[in-house]
Curated annotation (Swiss-Prot):
Biased composition (Basic and acidic residues): 572-587, 634-653
Keywords from the named record: Metal-binding, Zinc, Zinc-finger
Gene3D superfamilies: Phox-like domain, Zinc finger, CCHC-type
Gene Ontology terms: cellular component: cytoplasm
Cysteine disulfide partners in this protein: none
Composition bias, Low complexity: 65-76, 624-633
Native species: Mus musculus
Positions with biased composition (Polar residues): 919-947, 964-982
Protein name (record): Zinc finger CCHC domain-containing protein 2
Compositional bias ranges of the Pro residues kind: 43-64, 949-963
Region (Disordered): 1-85, 205-240, 550-668, 904-982
Encoding gene (name): Zcchc2
Highest taxon, organism lineage: Eukaryota
InterPro entries xref list: PX_dom_sf (IPR036871), ZCCHC2 (IPR042793), Znf_CCHC (IPR001878), Znf_CCHC_sf (IPR036875)
Start-end of Acidic residues biased regions: 214-223
Length: 1166
């Protein structure tokens, strides 16, 4: 079985013995040919009689016999004569090295390393062999094993200088069970402190009393069962005695003690890691100095190097191992460690790939391509300071004087500016110097370690600890054939760090990354950089699989648009230079992902315009600290950052020059997610976003129309209570002059799909303007509701309502173009369609009986136009007519519970809970809200009002509070999906105060127990009265009335106004209704407040039945206990014992040694 794991060497690469043979073979003359023959050999079965000194060493080779028993065929079939005999000699030398040279600690560590290389079947077989071998000594070690695994205190074992204490600790560790954590913890506390050991070594070394402890008698005879004879150990680690005050045996016992403890499975992982660190400190303290190596006799040089490698851990990187191996004479039993084989790989060639300036400072970064002797190629990036310090500290024997002077002069030139340098090109000089570097420089250990290590600057910059050293194995015969491909891969693997500056006036380079099929070399780092989530979000918005545009095209377009903006706005030349510097860093990569630009949006009749999407949360290459540094502040894209702060803060209304410039469209919302949208309108280009917040804009004559404000998309880590900003939507216009209508955001993810074949597919709510007038734009809700965590919530909703302004220009057509498509509705009734659907048509004022009343909005002075809701708006008392539905647009707003098929291009619509928050028209239509009505509940009646808009259209900052006439004190202050502020008009067009449609004073809902008995609406949502990490879940069934005794002795309110009720934030992220904490108190029922309807379903818990008798909640029979299965109670109230405590797993796989045989007849019978 081991044959399948064997590499081209004689045994496994992790085994030190064969690897150590190679340096010795290289040192001997004429050993190259046997080395080649050993590459393909397989170890034959061990010889019957091997010359071993002490009796215990044969047991480990016997354990190794079964795996290597099938090797003769491989050994016999080796190329060259004498292959089988050479393999036998190799194996015999391995046995001699293991039994005679290694000490106990080194043998145990070596055997554990071999066991890690075995497969499970081999381990089972070796376990059987070990059981058989250990059974013979079981009756001798039985008492000690009981003491080691028992609960009794082993006694005082604190003084590690006593040989009896060390011997007893070694025996206890050897006999400790692998699952006895309690005894392992006790032994861990009894282990000597490594600091005390090191202090003792220093003290005895200072006194000069060496070998004082060596001749002390062993306190326990059982020590010999765990250790070999003192002769091999003393001779094997003779070097340790030269460096410390403890004797040979004491040093070996301490090493054995810490080695066994660091490898024992009974200790926890943390304990083993700590013990491994202590072992390394002890080994470094006991290791011999280089000057002592020259004084030692030459016949001990081989064993000294072997013990140095064996005492050193395989993970450790010993710098002196290679130097010691070079001094080994050919006559010693030299076996190199595995570490020496790794260090034997040297550098063959160093090429300077490129020099780039780091940020705007004066230092540079150097990217090197390093070819190693094992045919691997690495790309290393070093800073100017690191390279200069490395060359200054380089020993003189590894480099020539002319080389140092020339390269240091070039590096000193690199710290200067380009105009101050003597040599104009630094890169060719350094490239020539490194390519012609001497062999002594390339093969030195410090050069290898420098080009293997990770740059400290890279460790500082990348939070994911991604190494700037990436190795790609390239076969030698593929180097010449695929030189171009390999150079491209190396370019891909280069690191260039783009540092983003989050200051307001500083230029930034925030490049949005469009999803593209990346190659395997780049996608292996995707999970560490958060690109997986970005791909899932970005690729969901792509309707057609098209190739991504390069980032150079995007920024060249940005430069052209910026240059035109500079001509118009008179920007200084410094801003243009900043743009050029931005362009120089386009083809760079961040953390292994190449930056590319989003899609272009091509129009069929107008010029092409770039769809520039600003960087959002998942900008490629961002680290987690950058993403969460300022979550509630809007991101600035590259172009906005180049503008001055005064230009960004100015008030941009519909008459501003930005509305006239459709080619400078940019989607720079409130931390919006960078997505790529493929938009192909048939007749007119839809450009997405401008600098001042215009999101949707018709490309032909969009500047003639005012805008509809709506809530932009928020960053997904927006703090609770963050203020809402405004981004404006212009009302698009069809080819024949008819206004398409308004786009009303809902609280769910809204996707824009095409209703008819002539309509254009829109990626982000882009209305396609076609040549026909009978077109509908249908907005369906995605079945996935948008969590309320991603939406802004005001800290005091009753006082900080945001009233949006709706500015619509009347269409140029007559009122005949809007035929009445819906019959008039009777008073208090509901119209056609689902009760979850609201149609918001846009139509001409000629369809309304009421005459317009002038308002105070000074922006536009055109004819009035009304946006009304004729669905879900009960017309109450004296409404003379209903609002007709026009034929040119239909906006469907289903609630979150409406299941709609998700179109291929879905976009989480940036909406707050205000579904129809764009309320008053710009000139004559306003919110007909009485003092007790809900202004943000978004009701628009066919009549007119003189209430001005409370918020200006293009306020750049947070919206102020509305007028006092529009505030109210109910819990439904933030209601979004349904309309309750409906006014009535008489024939003269004056306002009649509407009947109160507020909630029931007892239950907070519109039920028959309050004053509004004629309105029975069972399936609707409540507002969100508070900020918090709540998730909105759809309501799956209607809400029963819970007015009887549901509140804490709350009196009935006849006026319909309910007291404001604010609950603390729920600690449950899933938003499920949990069992109330106060459920055991009297007169307490599940409180159903109106504000929680948007957070989670507000039906009462099935186990809580409200009553008026004051006896508390009652459990009904619908509840069952999962512990005992009986209905009527929960598992926490169950009287039966927990089933988890009774059902214990009976499957245990362990190695339990059998009882000691009464006599020796069993062995003979077997």
């Amino acid at each position: 079985m081991l044959r399948m794991k064997l590499p081209p060497k004689s045994t496994h690469p992790s085994e030190p013995p064969p690897d150590a043979e190679e340096p010795e073979a290289d040192a001997r003359p004429g050993a190259k040919a046997p080395l080649r023959r050993r590459r393909d050999c397989r170890p034959p079965p061990p010889p019957t009689g091997l010359p071993r000194g002490p009796p215990p060493p044969p047991s480990p080779p016997r354990g190794l016999e079964p795996p290597v028993a099938s090797g003769p065929t491989a050994g016999a079939g080796m190329p060259g004569g004498g292959g089988h005999a050479a393999a036998l000699r190799e194996q015999e030398r391995v046995y001699e090295w293991f039994g005679l040279v290694l000490g106990s600690a080194q043998r145990l560590e070596f055997m554990c390393g071999l066991l890690d290389l075995c497969n499970p079947l081999e381990l089972r077989f070796l376990g059987s062999c070990l059981e058989d071998l250990a059974r013979k000594d079981y009756h001798y070690l039985r008492d000690s094993e009981a003491k080691a695994n028992g609960l009794s205190d082993p006694g005082s074992l604190a003084d590690f200088r006593e040989p009896a204490v060390r011997s007893r600790l070694i025996v206890y560790l050897a006999l400790l069970g692998s699952e006895n954590r309690e005894a392992a913890g006790r032994l861990h506390r009894l282990l000597p402190q490594v600091d005390a050991v090191l202090r003792s070594l220093r003290a005895t070394r200072a006194e000069g009393s060496r070998g004082s402890v060596e001749d002390e008698p062993s306190g326990d005879g059982e020590q010999d069962a765990e250790k070999d004879g003192p002769g091999p150990e003393g001779s094997g680690c003779a070097k340790l005695g030269t460096g410390g005050g403890l004797g040979f045996r004491a040093q070996e016992e301490l090493l054995l003690l810490f080695t066994m403890a660091s490898l024992h499975p009974a200790f926890s992982f943390h304990q083993r890691v700590t013990l491994r660190e202590h072992l390394e400190r002890l080994r470094s303290a006991l290791r011999v100095e280089p000057e002592d190596a020259e004084v030692e006799p030459s016949n001990f040089a081989g064993s000294r190097a072997q013990n140095d490698s064996a005492c050193g851990d395989y993970i450790q990187s010993n710098e002196t191992g290679l130097v010691e191996q070079a001094q080994i004479p050919p006559d010693g039993l030299t076996v190199a460690p595995h570490r020496a084989q790794r260090e034997a790989v040297h550098i063959e060639k160093i090429m300077l790939k490129g020099v780039q300036r780091k940020r705007a400072d004066k230092y540079w970064e150097y990217t090197f391509k390093v070819n190693w002797s094992d045919l691997s190629v690495t790309t290393v990036t070093k800073t100017h300071q690191e390279l200069q310090e490395f060359l200054l500290k380089l020993p003189k024997e590894f480099s020539s004087e002319s080389f140092d002077k020339t390269i240091l002069k070039a590096l000193n030139q690199g710290s200067l500016r380009r105009e101050e340098r003597r040599h104009p090109d630094l890169e060719p000089i350094l490239r020539q110097l490194f390519s012609t570097s001497p062999q002594a420089f390339l093969q030195s250990h410090k050069v290898r370690s420098f080009f293997r290590s990770i740059s400290s600057e890279s460790q500082h910059n990348f939070n994911n600890l991604q190494s700037s050293l990436k190795t790609s194995k390239i076969l030698e015969h593929l180097k010449e054939d695929s030189s171009e491909a390999s150079s491209q891969e190396e370019d891909v693997l280069q690191h260039t760090i783009i540092h983003k500056k989050h200051a307001g006036k500083s230029p930034a380079l925030n490049v949005a990354t469009s999803c593209s099929p990346l190659d395997g070399l780049t996608m292996q780092y995707a999970e560490q950089n958060g690109i997986v989530d970005w791909r899932n979000q970005g690729c969901a918005a792509i309707q057609h699989s098209e190739h991504c545009v390069s980032s150079a095209d995007q920024h060249s377009a940005e430069k052209r648009s910026l240059s035109s903006g500079n001509k118009k706005k008179g920007k200084p030349q410094v801003e243009k230079e900043k743009v050029k510097k931005t362009e120089d860093r386009l083809n760079s990569r961040i953390n292994g992902i190449r930056l590319s630009a989003p899609q272009h949006v091509h129009g069929s009749t107008v010029k092409d315009m770039n769809l520039d999407i600003g960087s959002g949360h998942d900008t490629c290459g961002e680290t987690s600290s950058e993403s969460y540094s300022s979550p509630s502040s809007p991101r600035h894209d590259g172009r906005e950052s180049l503008e001055s702060e005064e230009e960004k803060d100015r008030d941009s209304d519909s008459n501003s020059e930005d509305s006239v410039n459709p080619s400078s469209a940019r989607f720079s919302g409130y931390g919006s997610v960078a997505q790529t949208i493929a938009v192909k309108p048939p007749a007119e280009t839809v450009s997405l976003g401008t600098e001042d917040g215009n999101l949707l804009e018709a490309a032909l004559t969009s500047h003639k129309y005012p805008h509809i404000p709506f809530m932009p998309t928020l960053h997904c880590v927006t703090h609770n209570g963050a203020q809402k900003s405004q981004v404006v939507i212009p009302s698009p216009k069809s080819a024949d002059g008819k206004t398409l209508g308004m786009l009303v955001p809902n609280a769910v993810a809204i996707s824009a799909v095409m209703e008819s074949s002539n309509s254009a597919p829109v990626g982000i709510l882009g209305p396609a303007a076609s040549g026909e007038s009978e077109k509908h734009l249908e907005l369906l809700a995605s079945p996935l509701p948008l969590p309320s965590t991603f939406l802004p919530h005001s800290s005091a909703p009753a006082l900080q309502l945001t009233l949006q302004s709706l500015k619509l220009q009347p269409p140029q057509g007559s009122s005949d173009s809007c035929p009445v498509s819906i019959p008039p509705q009777p008073t208090g009734s509901l119209s056609i369609g689902s009760p979850n659907t609201a149609f918001i048509p846009v139509h001409n004022p000629g369809s309304f009986p009421g005459s317009p009343v002038a308002t105070t909005d000074p922006i536009t002075k055109s004819a009035p136009q009304v946006v009304g809701l004729n669905q879900m708006v009960p017309q109450i008392e004296g409404n003379t007519g209903t609002v007709p539905q026009p034929s040119n647009v239909k906006v469907v707003l289903p609630a979150a519970g409406l299941s709609a098929a998700q179109p291929p291009a879905s976009f989480p619509f940036p909406g707050s809970p205000q579904a129809a928050s764009a309320l008053p028209t710009q000139n004559s239509s306003a919110l007909n809200a009485a003092t007790s009505a809900q202004p943000a509940s978004t009701g628009i009646s066919p009549s007119q009002s003189t209430v001005p808009p409370a918020v200006p259209t293009h306020t750049p900052g947070p919206a102020p509070s509305p007028s006092p006439a529009l505030t109210h004190s109910t819990a439904q202050s933030d209601s979004t999906s349904y309309i309750s502020a409906v006014g009535n008009t008489n024939a003269n067009g004056t306002i009649v105060p509407p009947q109160q449609m507020g909630p029931c004073g007892s239950c907070g809902r519109r039920c028959s127990c309050g004053t509004n008995g004629n309105l029975q609406l069972n399936s609707y949502y409540y507002p969100n009265p508070m900020p918090g990490p709540m998730y909105r879940l759809p309501s799956f069934f209607t809400l029963p009335s819970i007015c009887n005794g549901s509140y804490l002795n709350q009196a009935h309110q006849s006026n319909g106004n309910q007291l404001p009720f604010f609950l603390p934030q729920t600690p449950y992220a899933n938003g499920l209704v949990h069992d109330p904490v106060m459920g055991s108190q009297a007169s307490y029922g599940m409180q159903q407040m109106a504000g929680f309807g948007r957070l989670y379903p507000v039906y009462p818990a099935p186990n809580v039945v409200a009553n008026t008798s004051g006896s508390g909640p009652k459990k009904n029979g619908n509840v069952s206990c999962y512990n005992c299965g009986v209905s009527g109670h929960y598992a926490q109230d169950c009287k039966q014992s927990s089933m988890e405590a009774n059902q214990q797993g009976t499957y245990r796989l362990r190695y339990a040694p059998p009882l000691p045989p009464s006599n020796d007849t069993l062995d003979s019978a077997d």
